[in-house]
Structure formats: C-alpha cells, structure tokens
Amino acid sequence: MEGQKTELKIIRMSEVESQEVKWLWYPFIPYGKLTIIQGDPGDGKTTLVLNIAAKLSKGECLDSDMDVQEPVNVIYQTAEDGLADTVKPRLELAGADCEKILVIDESDKSLSMADERLEEALAKTGAKVLILDPIQAYLGGGMDMNRANEARDMTKKLGALAEKYQCAILLIGHMNKASGNKAAYRGMGSIDFFAVAKSVLLVGRIEGEPNIRAVVQIKNNLAAFGHPKAFMLSETGFRWLGDYEITADEVLGGIAPKANKLEQAKQMLRELAETTNMVQSNEIFEMADKQGISKRTLENAKKELGIQAKKINNSWYWELDAVKQR
C-alpha cells in the first residue's frame, strides 16, 4: 500500500518578507537559531554559559558586543549537576537574578530534544535563551546521535523552535577524543549537529596559561567570524578578559599561542615613539598588518597606551608623546 501523497506547495520568493538577523551577542550567538558551544570536559563551557545567563538575568552584558536592553528569562537544563548544591551556588557566585533563571522539572520524566515541554516552556515564560547542557543527555532513549538522519531531524525541530519564538538555543557539547581532527569532527557525534547550527564556539585551555580559557568561533553562517575571546577562572570566580590572540588550532593542539598580539602591538608603538612624536595612522596600520596584528588589536594597544589621534590636513596622525611617559 502506497503512503499518502504529500501535497505540493510552492513558495514564491517575491512573497517572502526579508528580515535581518537579530543578535544576542554579535557575531557569536544569534536569536532564532542554534548555537553550539563545545569543548573538552572541565574546560569551562558550563562556567561560561552560567555567567552569560547571570548577566542576561540582570539585563547586563558580558561582552561589549552583546545587545541586552533589559533582564530576560533564561531556561537552563542540565543533566550533569545538582540544582541545589552546584548550579544555584554557581549562579549566585556569578551574581544572577535567580528569579529569571528557569528549569523544566524533570523529576517525573526526563527531558529530550523532542519533548513538547520545550515549546510549552518557551511559550509560557517568553525566555530569550534556552540552554541544554550537555546536549548528549537530551537525545532521548531511542536516538543515536551518530546517525546523520536522526541528528538532522532532531536539530531541525529545535531550529524551528528557535525561529518561532526568536530565542537563542545553546547546545553545550563535549568533544570526542579524536586528537588531531578538525573541530567539526571532534564535536557531538554526527556532523549534522555541526551543519545545522549557524554558529559554533570552541572553548578550551590555553597552553602555558592554566587559569585562562579561550573562546574561538569555528563556524559562522551569518556574519564574519568573531575575534577570539578569553576568560579567567580562579578561586575568586570568573573574570571576562575580552579579545585574545589565539587560533582554534592552538587550542585544539595544546600549542602555546604565538607572542600575544596585543603586547606585540604595544611594543611596536613604543619603538616608534623612541624615534618620532607623530606618525600618520595609515602608516601604523600598514606596519601592524605586516606583523600580523589586526586593526582591532592595534586600536586596543593605542587605547591602553593613552595615544591620541589628531587630524591634520585631512589626514589622521597618532601622537606618541604619551607612550614616552609610560
């Protein structure tokens, strides 16, 4: 017996209304899409997302590129940590408004990615962020995440929820142990998880810096790749460091990053200041580019050294006197 025929429906692109992507954290976490945050166990993924959640609960920004106007509800599901003895103390340490951090009760039945309670919770709470940590625990008993078709169907359903409710869905995943492989293939089982997500962030240790963790974007379908970031873990808690010069290969391979580009940029400016008081900005940018220093890093070095820009005859110059006084 043949199955029921599916009705053909045609969509004319002229009838589709164009929309801009909205961002929670540009260009790392979009609204209405899936974002994967992956890394080895113990490397700080959960600490990062809990601190993001804490900031959002108070209407604050972790990073200057975040767009947070007011406190928002965050749904955080975890299968690895106790709510009372681990999750809440960590949220309190991060300064969260725990009234805004919500959890779907799994005491009667474990939650899965296909569970209708996910949509019910989004509709009821208006949460702008949903976090599943780790995603491996929310597959459901009958799903094999290494089967491409099953992974694709499951993530498409989650993606549809994100789009319908314009929330950011974050999937936290452990890396596998296939050392030397690309990050996409060291992720969460089927490559289809990686394929459906619009943004993928790698969180990992930095060789030679035991208390610092890097955040490197390894996939972005919606914008240019974001600059790598970093945060510090210590006995006193979490501290956001912002921009950091490191690559995904250095994180994955346990390779110490090349000379810190910010320090390299500051040293270049100090050496310039020894021979001149003022240099045209374009010349400085060209010098930095030859040394592999990005414009953004150079601007950060300029700010830290207290250098001022001055316009002369329609050209911009950097005054280096401040560098000599440091």
Indicate where each model-derived feature is located.
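Conserved beta-strand segments of alpha/beta enzyme cores
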Residues: K100-L102, S199, Q308
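C-terminal regions of RecA-like/P-loop NTPase motor modules
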Residues: M1-K9, P41, A123-G126, K164-Y165, ...
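Conserved inter-motif catalytic segment of the P-loop NTP-binding fold
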Residues: E2-K5, Q19-E20, L24-Y26, P30, ...
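Conserved hydrophobic/aromatic pocket- or pore-lining residues that grip, position, or stack substrates
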Residues: I29, I37, A53, Y76, ...
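Hydrophobic positions on the alpha1 helix immediately C-terminal to the Walker A/P-loop
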Residues: L48, I52
